[in-house]
């Protein structure tokens, strides 16, 4: 029945136009064409003469010409026609308007939508006549035309709307209505709307929406209308509402000047864009091409659910609607029906693919077309590990240093003026003793004070005053730079000293210690991300795409698009964190732009997608507890480097006890440190002399250096170093060496055109000194390195551990997202990506933890030994240094097997220095295993998995960047093929392109016997060093891949190893790219290439890594906790009553209903898997910190906290034997939606975990905010003991949340138990254990499930450690099998204690109160929540 009959052909109008599929060879690359010269009947006769070999599904487009011929429609139809079995027919406007529906050409699928002038009645009649498959329901389009019906449907679906009322007027008697108008309000049907409010016509076709302002704001109204030129609204002084017509009156939502437009394609895909609100000023912002400026935004999890609900409720597959984000909530204010995204090639690809698959899935069975939805790599992200096995990628964690920056500069001065103290108090400096000022208004206040003091000091001359005047002048000049405050490139830090600053690092000689308190003012400027740094970050982001699966097939488009499509769904859980430094945040934004193929400026990307981690210590280094250790190290370092004698054996032992190769090489270059410092100082003097001479040259008057620097600023930079490096005593300030190296490296790279003499020698000597000073400042011995490192990055280590452990907790994901099965093997799987952008200190520290913390025994692990040797040869962790942890899951292994989860550790030293090839080549990896050597070999290579399709187009952003051809070496044989899965061989194909060569993210080095060249492999790009892939212990078979995909393999040839070793490993940055006008980086100097990732180890298990991280955190928790407690106690005595750590004040809102974690949300059903897009990072596990919703089906905030706390126990202390227990959840693909997920845990793991919790030394607190902070990574010791604070203030404790009662109760319970233990020590294990369980049940009034919620239960009732004998604690894990025997007795005992001391009702009321406080705190304070919310935790 697929063919058209002759009668139907004769009846069709001659004005209908046909789009034919890509099967026609003459239609060119676009795949479609429009026949306008022939009549339709002739066309059909031709088709009948050439009976098509295959059935065709005809897709009819029924819309007004303006819509059906629009650019988005044309782009999507072009792509739709690439489906072999689809033929697209466009009904002409004349046919639609003038022909009866019986004469309209028949079709099997109809895409029809209403717009101005469209006869919707005829379209409905046609659909009844032909009964086609409707993409957008036609009857519901009547409702979409009436805003009253739209709001009614939205309300019925439980979707949040602004508060509104409908005013219906009878046209005959418009004065008869329920409207009472006041000066600053209107009352509609009894509902009062104070100004500002919005007045909307009930007809959706009427775009004359008015917003009325209150008289206090000047009154009048803003009149919105459909865009006319560059205007979308005008202001009117008229303040009275309209007197004729029916309207909807609704509350005005303050949206910070932006509207969010959401575009769905089916219930499972949504794209969101933000635009300037037309209500702001009415001016439409347009780009250079005249298009309205929009930028992609990320939708929160709840907003994605709204998109699905809107799509389903209105039965519109393609549907657009408007979101207002205000007050931490999102509201739907309009549903537009059929609507496309404009100017997004990625959206066009995805839209056509989804529509085509939808049509084929619905209609293909009727025509016996052999078709099924292809299982793609983004459905199951199975990729090759570097060891060659095929596994599912589950988690990518990357810690990345910021990009190239301008030299950092710093000035310190002591201030005692009352105005500075007033400023310090105004911004809350006394709460912590420190204050950081970055915002423009804050810097303006500092500048105002500085100007005032300078005016006063002019009247008081004197030597001391002159020095202070000089510093104030410098402070003033720096703050006045650029003529504006960006808040990114300058900051002022104030530190309170109760007895004055004891010493000044600036070399000031204070005659006596001032008795009065003073403030140390530290001004920092410079350190801005350069255009080169932006290019580096953006390009590295593009390269990172290639670590992710997908992107193969006809819709690949460009390298890495698999990640983009993955990210457009629920399946990519991406969060990007950055410290509060401007260069770090801009690096993160540029990286996100490249990673997600975003467009536009970095600022909106930064605002939308990069989370600041500066409030929790996650990525910033303000740890004071380790300053003593660092001072000792620096003092010893300075002492050694101040010796005017060649290095002797003792110096080598003292300075390089770890035997680092790079350190020994630098020391051999230095020989005598003082003599080298003399040379460096002389070269700096010569340099400043050359700059002064150049400034006298008239031709250099207007000379502009890199990044708009002038010769004056350059001289100022070097003169300060010249003054500070050699002190008055003649000794050298070793701490200035990194700054000197920083400056000369910057000038050699960016200002080489000046031709200054001696810079190369200065670079060589300062680098040698810096290569000693910088790494050794983080510790000289192994123990010092680990101690200092953990002090810097303990919160980050905990966060990494949490990230790794929560990857298999799919159940918590399901609670927030409709992950419906699409028939794939594992529909709900996610790739969890966490990117942490930070500064050099954290990268050094984290690497030190892995190198010296005892991850593996290098004497027993040859691969780790080679990795340590490679790291030892790295002299500098340059810009864009990366430490990448990748977690894979082997679904063929037993869930409890240690081989189930596979961890790889990768590293890159960042951008290449000015000395090309200064970093060592990667060492390559072939895990030495007798099993590997004995196995039969099989030809194949990972890299041959990258087929180059002629039809694939290169990355559009990289088309202008020609790359040199690089031969990619491939091993001839690769043994031990295992774990290969059907349909999983398309990995890394997103890296193929039509370019002759590409950026390879893995460098090459291989024995000559294993080298061969392949036409496929040579066109691959890759993120990792081919050393890893070539030396892998196993790899998929290339022949199998070619056989599966029908590809012909080109002949292979040998390529000598040396040719590969000396080809630059990475050639992705080029002058042509940097200077191309479309890339916006004109004036960039040569951007250095980045070293590829080298695999440090590719055979780690998750248990190994988890135990290692837990051990490192545990080892340093106690001492750190004591130091922090002492610091807090001392500061608490001086703090005001509004202590920042006190519990949140009680707010009033209905308490949230707790739901058990295994319960499925009410909307969970068995539809297709969700693929909702948000063009920006989305969290499939949590709600965005800035958006909390009141939808009827949302999970409670407390539920989310419980889920977060499940992983928290893994961050804390381990049982007596130091081995944590892990609860691995099985995949839920076989369960019904109503069934709770099956949790499998080792026998006794529940009991071990609970006992573990009772023995932990963790602050005793109920306050949920503490738990949130702890999960983010704040060290336990840095969060004060809330119970102790509240005990000091009994009124606060009684009136707020009374957290101490539960703690006291638990103590009494344990005292009772310990008394029993003395009589019967064998039962002590059971008693302590089970009381915890029963107490948790009674306090929380819900059962404690095995292996899942024990952490949060005990966390909230406190953990008294002093009452538990150490010996029984150690024996708990050995006797877990006997614990259930005494359950009833313990239950009765604990019940008696509860009844005696405190009724359980009171405890449960406290719990409800806390839940209420947390939910309201989150709703009321979105700024704080942005830092502390669950989304930030995940």
From Swiss-Prot:
Keywords: ATP-binding, Cell membrane, Cytoplasm, Kinase, Membrane, Nucleotide-binding, Phosphoprotein, Transferase. Residues 1165-1183 have a biased composition (Low complexity). Residues 384-455 are annotated as: Polyphosphoinositide-binding domain. Gene3D superfamilies: 3.40.50.11950, ATP-grasp fold, B domain, Phosphoglycerate mutase-like. PROSITE patterns: HIS_ACID_PHOSPHAT_1 (PS00616). One of its GO terms (biological process) is inositol metabolic process. GO terms for molecular function: 5-diphosphoinositol pentakisphosphate 1-kinase activity; ATP binding; inositol hexakisphosphate 1-kinase activity; inositol hexakisphosphate 5-kinase activity; inositol hexakisphosphate kinase activity; inositol-1,3,4,5,6-pentakisphosphate kinase activity. One of its GO terms (cellular component) is cytosol. It is found in: Cytoplasm, Cytosol; Cell membrane. Substrate binds at residues 66-67, 226-227, 261, 275, 339-342. ATP binds at residues 147, 200, 207, 226, 250-253, 259-261, 277, 322, 334-336. It catalyses: 1D-myo-inositol hexakisphosphate + ATP = 1-diphospho-1D-myo-inositol 2,3,4,5,6-pentakisphosphate + ADP; 5-diphospho-1D-myo-inositol 1,2,3,4,6-pentakisphosphate + ATP + H(+) = 1,5-bis(diphospho)-1D-myo-inositol 2,3,4,6-tetrakisphosphate + ADP. It is an enzyme of class 2 (transferase). The keyword Ubl conjugation does not apply. It comes from the Eukaryota. The C-terminal acid phosphatase-like domain binds PtdIns(3,4,5)P3 and InsP6. Despite its similarity with the phosphatase domain of histidine acid phosphatases, it has no phosphatase activity. This is Inositol hexakisphosphate and diphosphoinositol-pentakisphosphate kinase 1. The gene is Ppip5k1.
